[in-house]
Amino acid sequence: MRPKRIIGCTVAAPVVAFSLTKFFNDHGIRWNWVRTQPSFHGRMTLNNCYENPGQLGADRWYAAVGAADAMLEERRSLLVVHTGTATTVDSILYRESGVYDFMGGRITLGPTLMKTFLTKGIPSLTDLDGAYDALPRSTRDAVMTGIIDAQV
């Protein structure tokens, strides 16, 4: 089954988007890369309160749009958390009558990057396949516990 249209979102290196775009064009597939907006209007409204709305990654913006829409019936403020290459935690403030504000958030290294940087930066750390422990008693468990704790 061949897609008729692709709607994508990427914050990867431009070469990734270029390669995908070329593939779509070569196969006659219509495509559109979505970008962050100053506001979203649908079943609910989400206002982008970033100093420069265009600097907010489209991945974070559309995760916020999806979360606000999915939780619309709850009428509550939200935290939207992504864990991948980076871990992001974003605050979505519920105002009234289906209106939300994207207030901003935090970005840190994701678990894989943390582990990679630790092994490259501290050559003596060779075995990092530890487990989470409330009070680790081995270096590998201490590293894994620290990485997991840093995500929350």
Locate the predicted segments by residue.
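Active-site glycine-centered loops adjacent to acidic/histidine catalytic or metal-binding residues
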Residues: 84
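Short beta-strand scaffold segments in enzyme catalytic cores
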Residues: 78, 87-93
